[in-house]
Amino acid sequence: MKKHLPLLSLLTGALLITNFLIAQKADKFVYAVTDINKQGPNWSYLRKIDLNTGAYSDVLLNGADINFRAYSATTRKQFEAPLTDVRYGTAVNAAFATGVAALAYDKKNNRLYYTPMFIDQLRYIDLKTMKVYYLNEMAFTGKPQKSADQGNIVTRMVIASDGYGYAMTNDATQLIRFTTGKKLEITDLGTIVDDQANKGVSVHNSCSSFGGDIIADDEGGLYIFSARNHVFKVNLETKVATHLGVISGLPNGFTVNGAAVDADNKIIVGSAMAATSYFTVDHKTLAATPYKIAGTVWTSSDLANGNLLATANRPKGSTIDLIARQEEATDGKIAIFPNPVTNNQFAVQFNELSAGTYTIQVTDVMGRQMVQQVVALGGSKQVQTIKLNPSAAKGFYLVKVIDQENKAVYSTKILVQ
């Protein structure tokens, strides 16, 4: 990041408001999907691992209970009668029916999003109430019939730095994006493409690249960790997957089935097959070292927390804080477009903010203040075009809007590409 961020131009006398990504303490836990039995293959029980101690919690949710009564994600009301499915009957009522291998933690809303392996549906757990919501009016992949080779089963999911959830099928022919706010929307982004430099290791190959998990970094990228321990980096803009290599140091029989970023910016990985230990992986070298679990080590089909892998360039010697997501406000008072920002400019639309004086604080991801601007806002429905200096560094910028009472009224993030 440059020492000084060029001042952003203001037009029409309105307010500069952009987006906000805040660096704060990393999550020191991961959620894990396990069986009720230590080595069991039924991925229907939710636990939490304390990364400070390596200890598992008791079962937080019994996802195998077919008498479970969930809620509609659309109406927010509890289903009045048990659900039925032509293939699975009333077993579809169980929160983790048919098992779960794709889980993502939404830090802002304190939710766990997931999809059952053989039920084409997005679901989420409200961790404040432990109520479970099913989006049963909308297909997740559009392919309810799962193929014999399990290529169209979703086994990877994460909340990325842009605040969207992303899920991927085993064969990487579908990258699914979903919103995480009040209104859930699902978009099929299409197939992942192999980088020409991959030297024959395809992201679509079942022998090398199926299964596993995905994590997100702080520059808008995704990392695939396959069950065969291969690692790919995915550019979300181009959907190109670049093969980075194979994890070294894992014992024979260890398959990566869950991955999450820990407080030291290492990737903790767990296995559904070999539960003698968890491991941490250095994303630069792909070398694995054992991670000690206290007490019983459970096999796990997936892991999730809210940490992003810190990969952005930072000043030498600076402390790395993992990036915690803080998504765009959803009250409609302010809208920003486009985001990610292209051509070094974007528009800010003010819909319902009261007239008055506001202070804009712009900081980088290290928390250093770059700009403080006081602006008078005259009314609603004002649109402000913001032009960035073409020489401004690419990446995230952090912005907070403070009112006359020194209260933050809006915060979000932009990614400048």
At which residue positions do the language-model features occur?
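Residue-level detector of Asp-centered blade-edge/turn motifs that repeat once per structural unit
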Residues: 24-26, 105-109, 159-162, 216-219, ...
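Short, surface-exposed loop/turn motifs with a glycine/proline- and acidic-biased composition
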Residues: 376-406
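C-terminal tail/sorting-segment detector
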Residues: 3-5, 396-417
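Conserved beta-propeller blade signature
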Residues: 27-34, 111-115, 164-168, 221-225, ...
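Blade-level signature of beta-propeller repeat domains, shared across WD40, Kelch, NHL, RCC1
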Residues: 272-319
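Repeated scaffold domains used in trafficking and secretory/extracellular systems
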Residues: 66-74, 95-104, 142-158, 198-214, ...
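Beta-propeller fold detector
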Residues: 56-86, 133-141, 185-201, 242-248, ...
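Surface-exposed, proline-anchored Ser/Thr-rich loop/turn motifs
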Residues: 321-351, 363-368, 415-417
